[in-house]
């Protein structure tokens, strides 16, 4: 048996792109995409549209190793491009539409993007970002949206756009043979973990990793054939946790949603028979807080991740008819590879106990290899008592290849056979993981990751600021919001107010990163070595209570 080895027949490259081809064969007449009032496609039509776009990309010189970026919300075009771009051999790069122009330009330069698809309502953002690029700007492709008022207008400045999305579909070759990867380790997607302007972290994933994560996500969430999936999770967030490819694998219906609107979501659930949806805990807040909801006539499965939803929110959402699952993952893992696997006997527990158990992140998914919590000094596993903290490490097929153009960062994250997440947690006696803190000081607000260091960097540019530290403050709606503690310089003739400091930040960063609270202090608490004691500030922010009870 030792002589038996892999050969071309038993080791062709794994790729999630083949899910679309199979869906067109098996589920050809089934609905693939629903959007607005008039947009409906079948899986056969979606496959042909993607082939046409891939063909057109190839004809204009896009091919292997080229990066193609997309700046769009959850529209049909956004979904199709998750397949069409890799079918051309290129690497897909979804960009957060909530970023500012400066950050978008930095990301485009960093990855060397050759082409940028731009949604009609992101044109100004894209054009401003491109204007900041002095060399090699990407080709621009305009995406119209006939379902939205003003969405089918002509390109504002046609000279800056080389093509429209419809152009690429109409000129594409139906007989085009999509370009399969030469190796399953070839890059297929590139995601940025946050909008930093100093050191962007571009996470590169391969075909094999996305294939495994897509299948694993379906198995772990027990997604059946022909689900109806509502896109409340932005696809630009870690590629929608790999569900664009997963839903194709099971022939589901993708109900596309441009922006979150609770009353509209309830209508879509009712009209289309939605069975599954994903999102940050803020999604649960919004759905359970609106006055326009009605109890669901059938269960709807919601998968959430990040900061655990408060018990009160869980109970309200469940009373409406949502079945909530909680998990954990990172951009570097391509989706959720830890889930709070529910045990039937837990259903008999009081509601408060169920909420406590559901708030834990859980155990590895069935397709993942291993997770652990280790002592950062010794590298040994910590005691499984729910109290001893350590760094969360993991390994499995969906772990990233590395960070683009960052060998030092890659080596730091991938070492000793493990991916070091930078997150701090505990393992309970039953083997379930629970996150306790973010060692990298990441604030999770409404599902967006905010680096406290980035916010501090901006605040330090204010001439009145002496010292600043940013931590998370609890928020009943967003989960967390940035809270800045600021020490002002002495001798100021005019001291800035909290409102003025917030407005200063608003002009220099995306809206979701702007501190919602600015607290002025004489001096920041420090250790004997001069290091700011953020844990003290977190406790102060926690005692402040939630930021507010309103959405804005």
Curated annotation (Swiss-Prot):
Which NCBIfam families does this entry report, sorted A to Z? PRK08162.1 (NF006020)
The name this protein carries in UniProt is Probable acyl-activating enzyme 5, peroxisomal
Principal location class:
other
Hey, which family's this protein in? Belongs to the ATP-dependent AMP-binding enzyme family.
* Originating organism: Arabidopsis thaliana (Mouse-ear cress)
Q: Where is the signal peptide?
A: none
Q: Does the keyword Thylakoid apply?
A: no
State any single GO MF term.
Answer: ligase activity
Q: Does the keyword Lipid metabolism apply?
A: yes
> What function does the entry list?
May act as an acid--thiol ligase that activates carboxylic acids by forming acyl-CoAs.
Please provide an example of a Pfam family that matches this protein in its UniProt record.
Answer: AMP-binding
Can you supply a Gene Ontology BP term from the record? fatty acid metabolic process
| Record localization | Peroxisome
Instruction: Tell me where the sequence motif Microbody targeting signal sits in this chain.
Output: 550-552
EC number of this enzyme? 6.2.1.-
Gene Ontology CC terms, in alphabetical order: peroxisome
List the gene name.
AAE5
């Amino acid at each position: 048996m030792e002589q038996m080895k892999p050969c071309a027949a038993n080791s062709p490259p794994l790729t999630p792109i083949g899910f679309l081809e199979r869906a067109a064969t098996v589920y050809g007449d089934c609905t693939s995409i629903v959007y607005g009032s008039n947009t409906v496609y079948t899986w056969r039509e979606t496959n042909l549209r993607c082939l046409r776009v891939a063909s057109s990309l190839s004809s204009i010189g896009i091919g292997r190793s080229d990066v193609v970026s997309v700046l769009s919300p959850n529209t049909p075009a956004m979904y199709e491009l998750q397949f069409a771009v890799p079918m051309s051999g290129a690497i897909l790069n979804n960009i957060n539409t909530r970023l500012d122009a400066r950050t978008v330009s930095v990301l485009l330069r960093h990855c060397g993007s050759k082409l940028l698809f731009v949604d009609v309502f992101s044109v100004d953002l894209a054009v401003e970002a491109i204007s900041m690029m002095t060399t090699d700007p990407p080709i621009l492709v305009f995406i119209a949206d006939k379902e939205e008022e003003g969405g089918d207008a002509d390109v504002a400045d046609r000279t800056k756009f080389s093509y429209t999305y419809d152009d690429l579909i109409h000129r594409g070759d139906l007989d085009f043979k999509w370009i399969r990867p030469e190796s399953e380790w070839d890059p297929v997607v590139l995601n940025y973990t946050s909008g930093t302007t100093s050191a962007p972290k571009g996470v590169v994933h391969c075909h094999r990793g996305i294939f495994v994560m897509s299948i694993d996500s379906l198995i772990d969430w027990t997604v059946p054939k022909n689900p109806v999936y509502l896109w409340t999770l932005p696809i630009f967030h870690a590629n929608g946790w790999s569900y664009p490819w997963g839903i194709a694998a099971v022939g589901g219906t993708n109900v596309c949603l441009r922006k979150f609107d609770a009353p509209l979501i309830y209508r879509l659930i009712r009209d289309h028979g939605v069975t599954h949806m994903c999102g940050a805990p803020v999604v649960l807040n919004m759905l359970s807080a609106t006055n326009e909801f009605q109890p669901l006539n059938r269960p709807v499965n919601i998968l959430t991740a990040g900061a655990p939803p408060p018990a009160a929110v869980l109970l309200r959402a469940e009373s409406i008819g949502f079945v909530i699952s909680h998990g954990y993952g990172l951009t570097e893992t391509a989706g959720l590879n830890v889930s709070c696997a529910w045990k039937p006997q837990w259903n008999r527990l009081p509601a408060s106990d169920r909420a406590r158990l559901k708030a834990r992140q859980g155990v590895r998914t069935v397709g993942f290899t291993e997770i652990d919590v280790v002592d950062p000094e010794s590298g040994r596993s910590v005691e499984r008592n729910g109290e001893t903290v350590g760094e969360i490490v993991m390994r499995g097929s969906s772990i990233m290849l590395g960070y683009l153009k960052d060998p030092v960062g890659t080596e730091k994250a991938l070492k000793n056979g493990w991916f070091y997440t930078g997150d701090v947690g505990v393992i309970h006696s039953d083997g379930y993981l629970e996150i306790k803190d973010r060692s990298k000081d990441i604030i999770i607000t409404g599902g967006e990751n905010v680096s406290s260091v980035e916010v501090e960097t901006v605040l330090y540019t204010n001439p009145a600021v002496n010292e600043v530290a940013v931590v998370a403050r609890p928020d009943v709606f967003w989960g967390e919001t940035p809270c800045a503690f600021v020490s002002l310089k002495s001798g100021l003739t005019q001291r800035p107010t909290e409102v003025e400091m917030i407005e200063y930040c608003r002009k220099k960063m995306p809206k979701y990163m702007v501190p919602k609270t600015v607290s002025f202090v004489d001096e920041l608490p420090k250790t004997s070595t001069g290091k700011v004691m953020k844990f003290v500030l977190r406790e102060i922010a926690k005692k402040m209570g939630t930021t507010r009870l309103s959405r804005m």
